[in-house]
Amino acid sequence: RGQDISKFSDKLNLDTDLIVSDLCLLIEKLKLKNIILVGLSIGGLYASLALEKGIKSQGLVLINTLRKNNTRLKWINETMVNVARYGGTSLLMDMNMPVIASPSFLDKMKPNALNPSNYKGLEENTGIFKLMKGSLTANWDIDWSKIEVPVLIMTGHHDKVFRIANDIDQIAYSMKNVQRLEFSDCGHLIPLEKPKEFAIHLNE
């Protein structure tokens, strides 16, 4: 709920518990088998929490997900919500892109970016804003070491916001069955920046 044309009550809080519950319900309703959960950024946390709730998965792919819960992270997350409130996703993307994307991806985005006329604040009851605000309820103190399924960690080096190398190393080392892929020419949005390479690695 909250995505595109989905329906939800204006009074409903699209918090972490609801998002994870929706994921679990969708998987159970469709009776999906032999799945691999793939999550970008906080989506990887939601996927991991679904495993905690008993969802059966053959593996887990975490794309620029790993980070430690601290004042810096909370500051970043709350600021993103505030920016979206006053300038919408266009301002949020323009603000973030130079510090989360590779130079080549910035060049691709530039023609449609940095246009102040696109800066329109999100209404509080829109799905995207509710999801962003709900993301603030996420608990990043998850015990990653409890994950039993094989994990593939993808990290983009041009992500200067969420990529703290030492923190990622510490979390990755705590996991039981991990493979790591480093993308020196990508940032936070690996599936958008290098879609072919991303798909190839998933298929492998």
Task: Specify the residue positions occupied by each region the protein language model found.
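Active-site loop/oxyanion-hole signature of alpha/beta-hydrolase fold enzymes
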Residues: 1-38, 200
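Catalytic histidine neighborhood in serine/cysteine hydrolases
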Residues: 172-189
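Flexible "cap/lid" loop of the alpha/beta hydrolase fold
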Residues: 45-52, 56-87
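Conserved alpha/beta-hydrolase "acid-adjacent" motif
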Residues: 160-167
